[in-house]
Amino acid sequence: DATVKELSIMANQLLMSTSNIILNEQGNPYAVRKQGAGLASLFNAVNTKAYLTVDGIDRSKLELKDDPNRTGVYEMEFNLVNLSNETLNYRLSIVGMTESVSTSDEEFVAEKSQLLTDTFKAEIIQGGTIDNNVVTVNGNGVCKIKVTYTLTDENKKLIEDSFPYGMYVE
């Protein structure tokens, strides 16, 4: 039997894993700093066949952390937990973004996401398979996934030129 704390953790993981991304007036996702995991959906959380976990934390979130050498390379690991008896497939994708500069005053940020064109490579560490960024996890299985997210030289230059003291990537 699960404890109240364990049930609370799983409820948060289910809600975060199944939230809907909120888009701004330009049709781009709001920054994670503004929307968190997105708009929670009780329907999605109750009906999902899988959810995400991250080792070492109770929430289903990844943090890219600081990149002091400005390499533009970020590594993330997470687990895909299959609650069902059936084999499931999920296509991995990434929406990378940073801050944009105000068009009326370059001294300020616009508080609007600047989407980044970049690349990522995914690999299975344990418990599943991957082909062309489609992850397969067996029924009632757990698949540990590692994603390496790399900014293009163009995006690194954009961030450097716009924010010489650095800026977040999410």
Model-identified regions with their sequence ranges:
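Short, solvent-exposed loop/turn segments enriched in Ser/Thr/Gly
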Residues: R70-E77, K156-E170
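Hydrolase catalytic cores
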Residues: D1-Q26, V169
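Structural signature of outer-membrane beta-barrel domains
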Residues: N20, M97-E99
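Short, acidic/polar linear motifs in exposed loop/turn regions
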Residues: N82-E86, T98, D153
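Beta-sheet-dominated interaction scaffolds and their linkers
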Residues: L42-N85, S93, N132-V135
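Intrinsically disordered, low-complexity Pro/Gly/Ser/Thr-rich segments with frequent PxxP/GP/PP motifs
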Residues: D105-D161
